[in-house]
Amino acid sequence: MQSSHVKNETTYNIPLLINENVISSGISLISLWHTYADEHYRVIWPRDKKKPLIANSWVAVYTVQGCGKILLKGGEHITLTGNCIIFLKPTDIQSYHCEGLVWEQYWMEFTPTSVMDIPLRQQSIIYNGDIYNQELAEVSQLITSSDSMINNLAVAFLTKI
């Protein structure tokens, strides 16, 4: 599989938050992406990042549908399927790609503003997937607002879900 720039690889790859961090409710959200990828989607990390890699940040990847695979430094592979979330250290990620025909996911990079007990590399199933997906869609709408108060509300809502 050939790697190319992520913008040319997806059905859509929407940066919902990328220009500035939004701080609320214990986290500083660095970036939020909603990606609907096809079988050609392959990203070498952190080459695709639009912002500098921050060592103390976290990445949460929530798979809405389909299947994706993340390759970590050291050779470990993590396969993600629908209604599943995982938290990773961005410095551990080597690459990721769509594993199959489609991979719809939300990619969130954030730094905690307080001590958080986050389970690293442990996939968690979201059993109320339809509700969770609807809430993420609402966060996506709020985070794109030009009003900073609404952005803060979106991040607070994100930490709640």
Where are these regions (language model features)?
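Tight coil/turn sites that cap or link beta-strands
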Residues: 40-48, 82-83, 91, 100
